[in-house]
Amino acid sequence: MVEAHSRATGTCSSLPDVADAWSRVSVVTVTHHSGRVIGACARSVAAAARVIVIDNASDDDSCAIVAELLPDALLIRNPVNGGFGAGCNQGFERVATEFALLLGPDSTIDGAALALLVAAADAYPGAGMLGPALVAADGHIEPSHDLGLFARMGAGKRLDTGLPPEGPLSADHLSGAVLLVRMSALRQVGGFDPAIFLYYEDDDLCLRMRAGGWSLVLVPEARASHIGGGSSRMNLRYHWKKYWHYGWSRLHIEAKYRGRGRAVGIALGVLARYAGKALANALSLKPAKAVRDAARFTGSAAWLLGLPAMPDLPDLRKR
């Protein structure tokens, strides 16, 4: 395995044919109220041998758009939103190809970029996941790799804040917006943590990949587009949900890797901090900030009380 944040060794000079690259990949996409962006995503993967779309209880036109643009895709319509990671796991269970391309509904990729990712996967057989450089809607390069979660928290800032490296790089963490996943690695370490509804699920998978002996490789020559925010509705209800799960998942991941005692200590500090912030913002007539802080408080309290991130859900795996 290549050392983290070092230049990956090997070569990607043997670029496969684009059609060959698509034939080795199954695309997995999870949608939730994604009608605004899923059309561009679907068009970008029309050449794929297999596309698997898991819809998490959208009530917009997400499914209709997928059905129209990708009539041969496997479209699974979940009656309830079981979370991003659970949806991805449903898709992974149906992948029979060598690789899965995990593609957010607000992202697009072309055949040339995919071919570069597949070539890198062939060049670095120890890579469990590979990611491209991410290009935002305004054309700037987004951060797409970083230190591992706990090192990142200690550093206080992102590692990837400038231009991407010139060649492949082995990293501790890759963005989950677009990932080429080696299925043999995923089957070894397991898919996303089903306890996590939202946030930190990609950190958890990256940690387990590396613990399992697999490297994570950034392939900056491959570029994918990432609009961001494509599976959400920007209102106070969404704001609440977002920060509730942010609070819960942060403590779940802390307890999972560094012990419940440490997580409880963090939780108590969070409760004290965000109770005061929520009250102050409410009194200052700042509703969005008050909702944010109250949600963070409530999600953290729910974890501390042993409540799950979501109510009991039906088994979605075989739907």
Please describe what each predicted stretch is.
Residues 44, 55-64, 80:
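A conserved acidic beta->alpha catalytic loop
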Residues 172-190, 195-223:
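A short, conserved alpha-helix in the catalytic core of glycosyltransferases
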Residues 100:
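Short aromatic/hydrophobic "clamp" motif used to bind/position activated sugar donors
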Residues 149-172, 176:
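Short, flexible, basic/aromatic active-site loop/helix in glycosyltransferases
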Residues 111-143:
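Conserved donor NDP-sugar-binding/catalytic core segment of glycosyltransferases
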Residues 78-95:
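Glycine-rich, basic loop-to-helix element that forms the pyrophosphate-binding segment
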Residues 241-248, 260-319:
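Non-catalytic, C-terminal membrane-associated alpha-helical segments of glycosyltransferases
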Residues 29-47:
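Short, well-formed alpha-helical segments that are part of the catalytic scaffolds
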